[in-house]
């Protein structure tokens, strides 16, 4: 699309070049004959890939990724030649290593990116999504192995052991080399934070029993073992037993049994990690952090000037990073910046992305009476007598008229105070009851000396209201028309 320029000639014959933009605005600037083309998705991916490869740490990850693809291709060909389902299940662990390398590369990209307007908390959730996707895909592969193994139990084919043992050692060597050479922070954190799998628990029980006989092995066996290393060793052990039984007794069904065992161990190892990463994606609060957060919130509520801590919400935005928002209500005379600094100092040690809303107390309590109110309501005749004896309340200037909620004068232009109830009667005309007694409006002040009517000591003039239930007479605002007063 060509952008047109409008040439305007002023009175001084000075040319002014203006470029018409998309928003229909004319601005001064350089003429661009063609609009800048938008990049495609592949172009954006290529740009981000060049950004990652600019760091030398990614070269090692890319090298292991290429070796993984070559090794996985060789293992899949050997699985086809040997017709071994157990070796196929073990090859899926190599494919999982490829997913872990991609996750590691994505983690490096996240550290290089800065938060944007769309992703204000950063791109850490991409790591969580990568871990969740990898573990779920491996579990789906395990279910596929279980389905194929059930079909093989009906009709067991012959298994060739020519490259079975070679493929086992090649896969074990490459898997351990990848796990121990490349530091994968997301999977390391998940393996430590997630709950232990049933395979880890059984191995821990065997390790305790063995360490009771040989105490020297306690430093090696008693600590919590890496679940990825454990599943690789257990799978290689199952393949070794399968090779021996097929070679010695030609027991081909052992291959299917080993495939089922490897699939179950893989599913049991990946399931706790997928659950943990799924909870992070759901923005939940980790269970091991709830107690610490409660303790910190109690400390914040005891700070000087803090009246209330409410609407607290904390969630995980990534592995090891916690975000939160809290509302703090403080006194009117408290220093907002000082309270904010103290709250931030207490919570920032645990919550990396913290939002604190500090607002001052705006509650105002209406004081409608300065004396002691009567225990029983007054009758209508008592109101009439009081209105006849005492004169009306002296009028105040408009600028100094008290409000129902506060005792301070309010300006004519100021709005009514917050939480003040718009009680009727302040600007109402005097009300006359159609009875034989003299009447005065209900808002008359009690200023007469010596008479209190059960309202306590005489106080300043203010509005006093009582509720009249089922009054026998109607009342209007006008001239008295009843019988003559006595």
From Swiss-Prot:
Assigned GO CC terms: Golgi apparatus; trans-Golgi network membrane
Residue spans, topological domain Extracellular: 82-91, 147-161, 249-255
Q: Which domain of life is it from?
A: Eukaryota
**GO MF annotation: an example:** zinc ion transmembrane transporter activity
Region (Disordered), start-end ranges: 394-425
Membrane topology label:
Multi-pass membrane protein
Q: Which keywords annotate this record?
A: Golgi apparatus, Ion transport, Membrane, Transmembrane, Transmembrane helix, Transport, Zinc, Zinc transport
SUPFAM superfamilies registered for this protein in UniProt: Cation efflux protein transmembrane domain-like
> Membrane side Cytoplasmic: which residues?
1-60, 113-125, 183-227, 277-486
Q: Which parts pass through the membrane?
A: 61-81, 92-112, 126-146, 162-182, 228-248, 256-276
Q: Which family does it belong to?
A: Belongs to the cation diffusion facilitator (CDF) transporter (TC 2.A.4) family. SLC30A subfamily.
Task: Note the subunit structure.
Answer: Heterodimer with SLC30A5; form a functional zinc ion transmembrane transporter.
Function, in words: Has probably no intrinsic transporter activity but together with SLC30A5 forms a functional zinc ion:proton antiporter heterodimer, mediating zinc entry into the lumen of organelles along the secretory pathway. As part of that zinc ion:proton antiporter, contributes to zinc ion homeostasis within the early secretory pathway and regulates the activation and folding of enzymes like alkaline phosphatases and enzymes involved in phosphatidylinositol glycan anchor biosynthesis.
Q: What name goes with this protein? A: Zinc transporter 6
Q: What is the lineage of its organism?
A: Eukaryota, Metazoa, Chordata, Craniata, Vertebrata
Gene that produces this protein: slc30a6
